[in-house]
Amino acid sequence: MAVPKKSTSISKKRIRKNIWKKKVYRAALKAFSLAKSLSTGNSKSFFCTTIK
């Protein structure tokens, strides 16, 4: 006989959502930092040609 599943609690949903948000925030911060270093020319990990 089929039994309905228990619904996920609101606190558990919130915790999972916050974990996902933290991952996204860190990735965005890293991308922004890389973009800043490329624009100023201080990047040591990327070789990019500058157009003058």
UniProtKB/Swiss-Prot annotation:
GO terms for MF: structural constituent of ribosome
InterPro entries: Ribosomal_bL32, Ribosomal_bL32_plant/cyanobact
GO terms, biological process: translation
Top-level lineage group: Eukaryota
Subcellular location: Plastid, Chloroplast
A Gene Ontology cellular-component term: chloroplast
Keyword tags: Chloroplast, Plastid, Ribonucleoprotein, Ribosomal protein
Family label: Belongs to the bacterial ribosomal protein bL32 family.
Name recorded for this polypeptide: Large ribosomal subunit protein bL32c
Name of the coding gene: rpl32
